[in-house]
Amino acid sequence: MSRPNTRNKNKRQRPDAVDSSSQILRKIHEANDVTDDDINQLFMIWKPVCQGCRVNTRDNPNCFCGLVPPLNGSRKSGLWQKTSEIIQSLGPDPTLDRRDSESTPAGLTNLGATCYANSILQCLYMNTAFREGVFSVEVHVLKQNPVLDQIARLFAQLHASQKSFVDSDAFVKTLELDNGVQQDTHEFLTLLLSLLERCLLHSGVKAKTIVQDLFSGSVSHVTTCSKCGRDSEASSKMEDFYALELNVKGLKSLDASLNDYLSLEQLNGDNQYFCGSCNARVDATRCIKLRTLPPVITFQLKRCIFLPKTTAKKKITSSFSFPQVLDMGSRLAESSQNKLTYDLSAVLIHKGSAVNSGHYVAHIKDEKTGLWWEFDDEHVSELGKRPCNEASSSTPQSESNGTASSGNITDGIQSGSSDCRSAIKSEVFSSSDAYMLMYSLRCDKQENQEGQKENPIDITKGEVKQLKGGYLPKHLSEWINNMNAVFLESCKQYNLRKEKELNALTERRQEVRTILSEAAVQSLEEQYFWISTDWLRLWADTTLPPALDNTPLLCSHGKVHASKVNCMKRISELAWIKLESKFNGGPKLGKGDYCRDCLMDGARMVVSSDSYRDRRTFMKSIANDVLSGKCEDGMYYISRAWLQQWIKRKNLDAPTEADAGPTNAITCNHGELMPEQAPGAKRVVVPENFWSFLFEDALKVMSEDTLDCTCFPVDSSQCCHCTEVLSEVACFEDSLRTLKVKQRQNHEKLATGKGIPLTPQSRYFLLPSPWLVQWRIYINMTGKNSSSAPEPERLDGVINTLKCKKHTRLLERLPELVCRRGSYFQKNPSTDKLTIIPELDWKYFCDEWGGLMENGISAFIEVGNTDQSSSPDVIDLEKDSSPDDNMDVDAQQLILRASPEICEECIGERESCELMQKLSYSEGDVFVCFVRGKEAPKAMLEASDSSFEVDRRTSKRSRRTNYGNLTSLKVSATTTVYQLKMMIWELLGVMKENQELHKGSKVIDQESATLADMNIFPGDRLWVRDTEMHEHRDIADELCEKKPGAQDIEEGFRGTLLTGNISSEAC
């Protein structure tokens, strides 16, 4: 049982509309009248109104499906695209940048690599005392100090701006920071506080010392003599600090790092201390002692270490724990009566494994609410009651005045010393990315009965405005209010434009759906109008459609043409009135506006086409008989090739341009019959009736610039001029064929490319190999294309190019010889620039190609002893056979001499220029093979010594060897060896320090040298071995932490206001 045909089961079976239209037109032609039924059939008016087609049907004027998407659908563009995409065309939405609430902090924009500055600025701003100190700076001081003015404005925006983030561009430009280079947060904090301290010197008492009062502490470096017990004179000197730098390597907690920072260092041996009291070098101890602590203490965790082996910096990513509450009373050198209990207030985090890259974020505690916030540039998110997402534990902290506890942490509980009088239970947080810690001194309660905190800096009511529990000076308040007003106005205007756009969009969509629902004409008797489908699609899919345009539907008489039925739709009178009244245009094409004249002309053409098609079918049968040789009553010549193409063409209703010129191919330039021996001039004889049909069609379609269709009866004579030319060509080809045969006989071995055995004491001549190749192609080409092969140049000119003009000596090196089975041959005749030929062949060449016997470059082979001194034109024999074959030449050598001799001076100059050009490549491929083992195979060493041809294409199979695959690398002459090794590291996984790179037997180890310096050319094959001497590391470390060279010196904040020696007026 055969399978049912289901290939077309889902395709709509369309009636043969063309045949039915032709029948109607034939009927109109016979009746010479057009009826309403004919109009209904020709214009497809009879077709039903569609109800939900997948796409719009072109041949049904009553189909309005697919002009708009379904109710919940959308399109990629136009009126029906998604609402969100239309809103995007309005531009950025400023309401998205609005701050969620007054209690939510604002972020700072990242200008490229300014996350380090953003983190520090947020930490300073979130400190209430410092923020209010900045706000208290007098106006005249701000005008004299641009840095103070910009930080005050920045804090004012963070404090009261309606935007969720603040642009820090003005502050960064004022400091002259490079926003494309990431810097260290600790260095930035120290330099910024120092700069602000200088800028505040001319401020009032309230803010003059705010930096020192909040962030500055003091330490002293104490050296104690172990013999007399006295401290050195320098031990009494105190140094100020903004942050304590603590070691992290090998330490797991803040408590351990503080112990390490304050630990005793023994000075003994070669490191003994010279005691002034003892007047001798003695053993001593040295330590750091904390003298005073600031209200805000900052710990810088030294996560960056220097690796001597790689001369690079590396980040320590081990986990580090720190407590929520820190007791520093026991750490002071002198006991204090005040409690020195600090609460964790900020954690700066550096994300990333490299030192010179990555990203800084800050976790900061809100002093008022106690909630922690994450500040990630523009994005600010609430963290809750804990700063870090990593695990934490509860531990008691010692409050005793003795040494701080440093016991082990077990099950989350830290065991304190037995001297502890009380303990503060505190959470301990841990982080592998924490880079800086800030602790704030816990003060006694300073709240009044109303529960509001007292303002620590006295500011008069006339100078400030209270916002969110904070204070803004009047000038900053007015400035920020104006800025907020502009921002809120932009939000308002955007919302108005958005609302207007959406309302217009909804109204327009509803209009389209309403009119399309009323467009269908329900019966044949109703009045209807024609409308262009293209305009209807445009109207239904654009927000602002153009004026109504029905002109594409009109014929030359200004009526509706029946051929446009696929380009128009039939709509109701109600729909037409709505469209015409709103979009104007036209013309108005109603029920009776069809063109009767065009219909009658179309009917006549259909009848005429039927007659032409029948005649052409009959003529095709005659043409087939002509080509098969069955036609005996031929009277005229036509082109055989043209007739073959004519038969293959479809049976059309009227002649086309292809029917012109049935005799053009057999007509010569003189207008006569071309000889049949000419290319493409084959002809056939056709009957008179067939010729008349073809001639009639040719005249109908022939254009003015086309040649006349020449008639050639069978008794026409061939063109005598063309016949004579063809005869001359035939004679020339015969003589050329004879000449080539003779040259092949004279030079049998050279013509076939066979090797010519060489004998000592015989005379030979040297020919340029390119000339010999061209000659071989010329004499071996036969057949129709033999005369098209270019002739070789005359020998005199070719030989002269081989001699230098200055010394008239040979400009090419002599070819090498090889011994094979007792005979001597030229080693590489296919690649050598010169080819050795016998004397007889040179004599024949001189006679055939215009050479002079005495002008040739002669060569002869001599047998000499190995101890004889060789001249520059001597080529040693290369033994390419077994030892048994060369027993008679062990103590002697073959010497190839040339006359004239080779010119070493000119050849050296030319080779130097060629080498310089070859080493100036901008792009090329070198091939690298990874070799396992101590030595490379011999094949690799030989392959490495030779280079690939630059333009030669090689397959993958040809590059595959028994020692592995070659890896292709794109390089240039200026590529350094360091860059090449980095490419090898990336592709083969061999670390740069472990690469032993070779070209042949030569080691390539100068990383700063270029490939041109090392004579590495495109196509060279290199090999590399892994020494495994150094421990493996990630290539990302090398890319991010490459050694600073002359062009990569770390400049830090050099060139900015942070390091400039400026006066306070210029701050």
UniProtKB/Swiss-Prot annotation:
Biased segments, Polar residues type: 390-418
Basic residues composition-biased segments: 1-12
Catalytic activity: Thiol-dependent hydrolysis of ester, thioester, amide, peptide and isopeptide bonds formed by the C-terminal Gly of ubiquitin (a 76-residue protein attached to proteins as an intracellular targeting signal)
UniProt-listed PROSITE patterns: DUSP, UBIQUITIN_2, USP_1, USP_2, USP_3
Ranges where the record places region Disordered: 1-22, 385-418
GO biological process: protein deubiquitination; proteolysis; seed development
Localization (cell): Nucleus
Record's protein name: Ubiquitin carboxyl-terminal hydrolase 26
Organism: Arabidopsis thaliana (Mouse-ear cress)
Protein's gene: UBP26
